[in-house]
Amino acid sequence: MTIDTINERDYAMAMPEYDYAFWNAAKRKPHNANELKKGITNEGGAYLPLQANSKMTAALKRESVFRSLATISYMRDHGGIILAKHCVEEGCWTPENGMYTFGNGMGEFTEYNIKSHKLGTLLKYDEAYMSDIGLDIENHLIDSIAKSFGAMEDAAYVNGRGDIQPTGILHNTRGAEIGVTTSALTYEDVVKLFFSVKPKYRKRGVWMMNDETAYYLRTLKDEGGNYIWNHTNDTILGKPVHICNDMPSIGAGDKPIAFGDFSYYWIIIRDDVSVKVLNELYHDDGQIGYIAREYLDAKLIRSEAIKVIQVTD
């Protein structure tokens, strides 16, 4: 898809005529097929209107733990490579009329191949319910799709293999570095993990773990009886804790705690969300179906930015 084609599509998606046609089609009401055709995908779905797409982006950020922490970028053309800088940003002082002397920096970038992983979800509703004149179908569908996508995305952002889904932070070779190895998680191990992360990444660092691990850490004390968890503001060593139940529990061979700057985890949106209405497939059951899909990739572009605790056997 070329940039010109994308711009033309975006312009059409912003028009009120397209918005009206899209939502009438979603409710199986008469609609302008020529208007809707402007947003039809090669899979027979239709892209969300511009305003609805903005709502979807906001809803996904609410539903996905990672979307609120990661760097989100857009790469909707067919290009499949990004360059990420892997050095300390360069700067220098110079006299008022002096010249800056910087290197060319060409060797400071790492090339990453970006894929287009397709994520889909099927929603089914009672026909009478979806045709109810009082139903806010736009917000209802957006909320349902975002809940489904958000849950599936986070699972991949943690454990994804990078083949048919994004590469997760716990990937053995392309994920976060191991900061601490332990056979029994202690107060000291958590402190060690914190300081295993370089100061520049600790500055915006956050913790990530599941509920079971969080419960354990809430009870963890040092030898003086001091809790490691600040129960007043839910922080550990002054840094906020984010619960993601796709993280593993404390067990042999697992990585139950991650800490670092999650802005170095990049989520690359390859195509916007589209919805296909299944008018006939579930008609005999008195239902109407919707298939929503999106294309994206994600990966940790600086492995030292996030570190994990590895529990040994």
Language-model segments: residues:
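Short helix/loop capping segments that flank catalytic or ligand/cofactor-binding pockets
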Residues: 58, 84-85, 91-95, 102, ...
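Short, Φ-rich (hydrophobic/aromatic) sequence segments
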Residues: 52-62, 133, 137-153, 157, ...
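Alpha-helical scaffold segments that mediate packing/assembly in large oligomeric complexes
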Residues: 101-196, 307-313
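Assembly-associated, polar helix/coil segments characteristic of icosahedral protein shells
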Residues: 1-112
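Extended oligomerization regions of viral-like shell subunits
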Residues: 162-297, 305-313
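Alpha-helix initiation and N-capping motif
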Residues: 33, 53, 62-63, 80, ...
